């Protein structure tokens, strides 16, 4: 089975070699047909500490790296606004 790739925004980069990525998913409710947005946060491994707050990144599934990390940063899609 291929590994999942998700796209999201970095919401925290305060940990060493770890970033928190918020992934937004849009789907339609099966019964009421209302469009719903949900967000989920994933901790992702960032080996070189290159990701910054606000960056749009792609993350890929991996084997467990720690207790809560099961994703790795694949690439930075778009750099965020740094102030």
Curated annotation (Swiss-Prot):
- Provide the Gene Ontology terms for cellular component: cytosolic small ribosomal subunit
Q: Which HAMAP family match?
A: Ribosomal_uS17_B
Q: Which controlled-vocabulary keywords does the entry list?
A: Ribonucleoprotein, Ribosomal protein, RNA-binding, rRNA-binding
Q: Give GO terms for biological process.
A: translation
Q: Which domain of life is it from?
A: Bacteria
Natural source organism = Thermodesulfovibrio yellowstonii (strain ATCC 51303 / DSM 11347 / YP87)
So what family is this one in?
A: Belongs to the universal ribosomal protein uS17 family.
Which gene is transcribed and translated to give this protein?
Answer: rpsQ
Q: Which Pfam families match?
A: Ribosomal_S17 (PF00366)
Protein name, as recorded: Small ribosomal subunit protein uS17
Q: Does the keyword Iron apply?
A: no
Q: Could you describe the subunit structure of this protein?
A: Part of the 30S ribosomal subunit.
**Summary of the function given for this chain in its UniProt record:** One of the primary rRNA binding proteins, it binds specifically to the 5'-end of 16S ribosomal RNA.
- Look up keyword Ribonucleoprotein and say if it applies: yes
What Gene3D superfamilies does UniProt report for this protein, alphabetically? Answer: Nucleic acid-binding proteins
């Amino acid at each position: 089975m291929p590994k999942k790739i998700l796209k999201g925004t970095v919401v925290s980069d305060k940990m060493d070699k770890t970033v928190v990525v918020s992934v937004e998913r849009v789907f339609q409710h099966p019964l009421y047909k209302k469009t719903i947005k949900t967000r989920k946060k994933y901790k992702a491994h960032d080996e070189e500490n290159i990701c910054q707050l606000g960056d749009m990144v792609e993350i890929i599934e991996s084997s467990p790296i720690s207790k809560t990390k099961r994703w790795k940063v694949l690439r930075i899609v778009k750099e965020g606004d740094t102030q």
